[in-house]
């Protein structure tokens, strides 16, 4: 447990630099060709 909200000491050993299959991908290797970041609106965005 930590005393500071939303804090953690956990870190990955290496940075994810894989732009083809990693979490952050280049446009050429996107998860979906016609998708993008979702925009929240309404009650869920408040």
Swiss-Prot record:
Keywords: 2Fe-2S, Amino-acid biosynthesis, Branched-chain amino acid biosynthesis, Iron, Iron-sulfur, Lyase, Magnesium, Metal-binding
Statement: the UniProt record of this protein carries the keyword Iron-sulfur: yes
Origin superkingdom: Bacteria
Catalytic activity: (2R)-2,3-dihydroxy-3-methylbutanoate = 3-methyl-2-oxobutanoate + H2O; (2R,3R)-2,3-dihydroxy-3-methylpentanoate = (S)-3-methyl-2-oxopentanoate + H2O
Single biological process term from Gene Ontology: isoleucine biosynthetic process
EC number(s) recorded for this UniProt protein: 4.2.1.9
One of the record's GO molecular function terms: 2 iron, 2 sulfur cluster binding
Cofactors required: [2Fe-2S] cluster; Mg(2+)
Cofactor: record remark: Binds 1 [2Fe-2S] cluster per subunit. This cluster acts as a Lewis acid cofactor.
UniProt pathway: Amino-acid biosynthesis; L-isoleucine biosynthesis; L-isoleucine from 2-oxobutanoate: step 3/4; Amino-acid biosynthesis; L-valine biosynthesis; L-valine from pyruvate: step 3/4
Family under the similarity heading: Belongs to the IlvD/Edd family.
Chain's role: Functions in the biosynthesis of branched-chain amino acids. Catalyzes the dehydration of (2R,3R)-2,3-dihydroxy-3-methylpentanoate (2,3-dihydroxy-3-methylvalerate) into 2-oxo-3-methylpentanoate (2-oxo-3-methylvalerate) and of (2R)-2,3-dihydroxy-3-methylbutanoate (2,3-dihydroxyisovalerate) into 2-oxo-3-methylbutanoate (2-oxoisovalerate), the penultimate precursor to L-isoleucine and L-valine, respectively. Is specific for the (R) isomer of 2,3-dihydroxy-3-methylbutanoate, with no catalytic activity against the (S) isomer.
Self-association and partners: Homodimer.
Record protein name field: Dihydroxy-acid dehydratase
The species this protein was found in: Rhodobacter capsulatus
């Amino acid at each position: 447990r930590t005393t500071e909200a939303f804090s953690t000491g956990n870190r990955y050993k290496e940075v994810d630099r894989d732009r083809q299959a990693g979490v952050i991908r280049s446009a050429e290797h996107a998860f979906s060709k016609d998708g993008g970041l979702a925009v929240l609106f309404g009650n869920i965005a408040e």
